[in-house]
């Protein structure tokens, strides 16, 4: 199914694939609306040539498409279920400057404990790992699919 969103003043069309929940599609849309101002070249589901494909990504590109010095990816967003192994790999080997995990109504203390055990402090320092936990009723709150900016009352943001 195809969904039309108006996100941060841009029309964004997202496909809900077979087996994909609407919640997953919505988290991609909300994550995009939250971070496109900070990362203007933010893309949704762009293949990047790694073993993993991001739900949201902002490449660190200079002129002519060549990578700039530093992290290969300014921003990488994962929505819904993600393994601790994947999170740790992305932060340690993936060239990710900032990794955001988007969830809906997840048990935050349990997830924070798992993340802190799976990812060494040096790989998550300086705000590199971020958890965004949306309210359980976020689908109702965003039903119009017109989101200029995501209200702070819709989520909790935690640096891990």
How would you describe each model-predicted region?
Residues 86-93, 114-115:
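A short acidic, amphipathic alpha-helical/loop segment
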């Amino acid at each position: 199914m195809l969904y039309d969103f108006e996100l941060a003043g841009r029309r964004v069309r997202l496909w809900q694939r077979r087996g994909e929940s609407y919640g997953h599609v919505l988290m991609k849309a909300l994550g995009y609306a939250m971070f496109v101002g900070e990362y203007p070249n933010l893309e949704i589901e762009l293949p990047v040539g790694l073993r993993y494909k991001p739900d949201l990504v902002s490449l660190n590109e200079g002129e002519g498409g060549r990578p700039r010095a530093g992290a290969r990816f300014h921003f990488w967003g994962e929505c819904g279920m993600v393994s601790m192994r994947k999170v740790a790999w992305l932060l340690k080997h993936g060239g990710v400057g900032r990794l955001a995990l988007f969830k809906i109504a997840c048990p935050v203390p349990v997830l924070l404990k798992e993340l802190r055990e799976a990812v060494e402090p040096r790989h998550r320092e300086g705000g590199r790992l971020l958890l965004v936990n949306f309210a359980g009723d976020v689908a109702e709150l965003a039903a119009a699919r017109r989101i200029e900016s995501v209200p702070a009352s819709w989520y909790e943001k935690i640096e891990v």
